[in-house]
Amino acid sequence: MAMAKAGAPRVSAAQLVTLGLSLLCAVAGPAAAQNCGCQPNVCCSKFGYCGTTDEYCGDGCQSGPCRSGGGGSSGGGGANVASVVTGSFFNGIKSQAGSGCEGKNFYTRSAFLSAVKAYPGFAHGGSQVQGKREIAAFFAHATHETGHFCYISEINKSNAYCDPTKRQWPCAAGQKYYGRGPLQISWNYNYGPAGRAIGFDGLGDPGRVARDAVVAFKAALWFWMNSVHGVVPQGFGATTRAINGALECGGNNPAQMNARVGYYRQYCRQLGVDPGPNLTC
């Protein structure tokens, strides 16, 4: 259930030109940090950099105080998240979990909607159909990772998921960075920047993700917006590759991969949209 490290995003020539202009504007104050992990009051640009000018907070802004194009419930195209993720939809997922599951009283629609306000780019930036597909994809992966919101933390807690080579995000003594939350965020190099972006000590207190449902959803959405959101238009298979490609794609574990596809198809049907092409990886 551990989340795989996402690869570096590919940047086109046109993006490099725009990125260069954005970096020139850094003199005005923004501190560039690839793949974001920005402070709460700083925007994450469509190319994954932190800043506060229009180049960062304008068109394509992924998270933070976006000024245009992001739009949590309006603007920038896409789907109205609160209208799509109804109580019936959310609780319908939870109802599939057993009565003794710890997550049944932890994961709530209100916690998700509270968290998604911090990520106005989620389910936005394209058409309403594309927005609904992104919502279906997010919940398909969350369903697979948590067993219909049954599990809060990874079952096997023996692995510390500490990568000492990631010196920017040093592991704290006695802490383990195993999977927690809707997407089972794992590894010190994910907890560290997620905590910095959300506003908690991800390295010193990774357990916060398992104690606070809003933080849990924010951590999942942080990973999603930084590592998955950009590949959603490529098809559901690309989102699986971004989350757990090393373990499930390329024939490594077709049963697990196809289980994700099954949930995605189911949720697309519920939301009234075609799942689109390229569902497998």
From Swiss-Prot:
The keyword Hydrolase is assigned to this record: yes
Signal sequence segment: 1-33
Record GO biological process: cell wall macromolecule catabolic process; chitin catabolic process; defense response; polysaccharide catabolic process
Gene Ontology molecular-function annotations: chitin binding; chitinase activity; endochitinase activity
Pfam families according to UniProt: Chitin_bind_1, Glyco_hydro_19
Compartment(s) where it occurs, according to its Swiss-Prot or TrEMBL record: Secreted
Gene3D superfamilies the record matches: 1.10.530.10, Endochitinase, domain 2 (3.30.20.10), Endochitinase-like (3.30.60.10)
Residue span(s) of domain Chitin-binding type-1: 34-68
Region (Catalytic): 79-281
Keyword Repeat (UniProt): no
Keyword line: Carbohydrate metabolism, Chitin degradation, Chitin-binding, Disulfide bond, Glycoprotein, Glycosidase, Hydrolase, Plant defense, Polysaccharide degradation, Secreted, Signal
Renumbered residue ranges of the record's region Hinge region (Gly-rich): 69-78
Intrachain S-S bonds: C36-C44, C38-C50, C43-C57, C61-C66, C101-C150, C162-C171, C249-C281
Glycosylation site list: N156, N278
Domain of life, source organism: Eukaryota
Main location: secreted
Function: Defense against chitin-containing fungal pathogens. Its action is countered by fungal polyglycine hydrolases, that cleaves within its hinge region (Gly-rich) to disrupt chitin-binding.
Note: Maize chitinase B seems to be less active than chitinase A.
Family, per entry: Belongs to the glycosyl hydrolase 19 family. Chitinase class I subfamily.
Record's protein name: Endochitinase B
Source organism (scientific name): Zea mays (Maize)
Name of the gene: CHIB
